[in-house]
């Protein structure tokens, strides 16, 4: 019989740098998960993606065991990196803070394809384009 799921925890952590400090410790500690075991497994799995922020979904079971799935980096993180920005615009409709090319949008969409609900690359590009516009990043051809 399958294990009974008690909780599902969603976090965004730096690749290869998970520590028992917040946000990991409190989120997993209150559910009785071995925090150090999670940190070691997460860091080992994400060591090759250093410098990226990765969303992770941790499934906690009744016997306090866990499994986790690492997703692709958020589109906003990839867009900021492509445009060379620290953060997006405070007023995206009025003030643009950076530029990305259509080719860069396609690259980001290809990276995001496994996690986006889009059926094809063109639809994924439109989703990423919307994220860019909401961050005040201009798309140039």
UniProtKB/Swiss-Prot annotation:
GO biological process per UniProt: translation
Post-translational modification: One or more lysine residues are methylated.
Highest taxon of the lineage: Bacteria
Subunit (UniProt): Part of the ribosomal stalk of the 50S ribosomal subunit. Interacts with L10 and the large rRNA to form the base of the stalk. L10 forms an elongated spine to which L12 dimers bind in a sequential fashion forming a multimeric L10(L12)X complex.
Function recorded in the entry: Forms part of the ribosomal stalk which helps the ribosome interact with GTP-bound translation factors.
Family of this protein: Belongs to the universal ribosomal protein uL11 family.
Name assigned to this protein: Large ribosomal subunit protein uL11
